[in-house]
Amino acid sequence: MEKQYLLYEGKAKKVYATNEKHVLWIEYKDEATAFNGEKKATIVGKGRLNNEITSLLFSLLHEAGVSNHFIRKISDTEQLVRQVTIIPLEVVVRNIVAGSLAKRIGLEEGTVMKKPIVEFYYKNDDLGDPLLTEDHIALLQLATHDELLYMKQMALRINDILTSLFRSCDLQLVDFKLEFGKDETGAVLLADEISPDTCRLWDVHTKEKFDKDVFRRDLGDLTETYTKLLQRLGGLSCTK
């Protein structure tokens, strides 16, 4: 497998073409951003840790029957994935009130919900990634009704799997963001990453944060936090 030209560079990753059709080469960066890019920093080691954690979690989800784009980890900061066309929606699952939800609906941060809430956000930096209803999504033709239903069902299934996994590590899965894409056959797959960049994780007992809120709120050293999370997950080096 050969890495070829750069296709896209985002806030946290670079995406390269390869010499194999429908396979992409992902490189995780040592960059942290928050508040839609208003806060930025270089965090040495962050790319390696997010690559390790995402590779582990996507492998475990694959074993649990969740179709996703991950193929294998190929270096400390790189992985191979199946090429997909990203559906321009962020699917957010919330188990505990935190972050923007607390501000938006006025409930105290830390309030445990009786059942998970699934939200859809438009992936559009110019608009500030607004929250959308299903009617908005239909109006903008971002996804079909069946695709939305599938993504919601998969998000809740992934939530069940990850909640159980993190609970075994004495962590609460507060909320998390997913992205999905369509492969060359039109099949919808879980894509992007699942890492402490995209999840809120709290220690069950102390409520210590094990996620990017440490950077957002200047609560400590991000590399140390992500390292502790990987250690709790077992520090496994996983491939599909």
UniProtKB/Swiss-Prot annotation:
Kindly name one Pfam family recorded for this protein.
SAICAR_synt
What's a Gene Ontology MF term here?
ATP binding
* Catalyses which reaction(s): 5-amino-1-(5-phospho-D-ribosyl)imidazole-4-carboxylate + L-aspartate + ATP = (2S)-2-[5-amino-1-(5-phospho-beta-D-ribosyl)imidazole-4-carboxamido]succinate + ADP + phosphate + 2 H(+)
> What processes does the entry annotate via GO biological process terms?
'de novo' IMP biosynthetic process; cobalamin biosynthetic process
Q: Which SUPFAM superfamilies match?
A: SAICAR synthase-like (SSF56104)
**Any keyword ATP-binding?**
yes
Q: What is its EC number?
A: 6.3.2.6
**According to its UniProt record, in which pathway does this protein act?**
Purine metabolism; IMP biosynthesis via de novo pathway; 5-amino-1-(5-phospho-D-ribosyl)imidazole-4-carboxamide from 5-amino-1-(5-phospho-D-ribosyl)imidazole-4-carboxylate: step 1/2
This protein's UniProt keywords? ATP-binding, Ligase, Nucleotide-binding, Purine biosynthesis
Protein origin, superkingdom: Bacteria
Intrachain disulfide bonds: none
What NCBIfam families does the record point to? Answer: purC
Do you know which PANTHER family this protein is assigned to? Answer: MULTIFUNCTIONAL PROTEIN ADE2, SI:DKEY-6E2.2
Q: Which family does it belong to?
A: Belongs to the SAICAR synthetase family.
In its UniProt entry, what is this protein called? Phosphoribosylaminoimidazole-succinocarboxamide synthase
Q: Whose protein is this, by species?
A: Anoxybacillus flavithermus (strain DSM 21510 / WK1)
Query: What gene name is given for the protein in this entry?
Result: purC
